[in-house]
Amino acid sequence: MLSAARAELGKRGGREGIDCSTFVRAAFSAAGVDLYSEASPRDKGVQAIRRYVRHHGRLHRRRHPAPGDLVFFDNSYDRNRNGVLDDRLTHLGIVEEVRADGTALVLHSTNHGVVREPMNLRRPHASTGAGGEPINAVLRRRTPHDAPGTPHFMSELFAGFGTVFGAEHPAQPVARRHLRGGARRR
């Protein structure tokens, strides 16, 4: 699944290319998993994928995800255009690797194409680490209308992780478990 996701790096994203949920769905489809199989007719792509994980995997908020875990984000854009940070499940990606400092490298599709970007939940408001290396990418574009303190980094917009494949048997979905009440907010 990760090799299929990596093969998409650099390909067009956004309106003219592959969006985030289509990118993630295609990567998992390469491993024989249809992430839309539990979708409700009203679900958007990210919602459909989260529903699949809720039914066939595990939703969690650990600080140390595993490679292959999904990462969900809220408020990556103002979907309902009301100027309020109330837009749940607006983006997702795939954790490619996790570094010793806790920085997860996330593969996801943006308006600039499929990219690899960092997210560090240990330091959610920092853009760089002690050595100047990037640890949190901007996910929500800054606008002149943003109030002070509006979240922009991936880590600030983090809504939870989803595990589809179990560590012991990477090709097998994990047992069904539910996170009570969905991914909790910090």
Where do the model's predicted regions map?
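N-terminal capping segments
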Residues: 1-42, 50-54, 149-186
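...with weaker cross-activation on analogous glycine-rich loops/strands in unrelated enzymes
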Residues: 36-117
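Aromatic- and glycine-rich peptidoglycan recognition patches
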Residues: 81-186
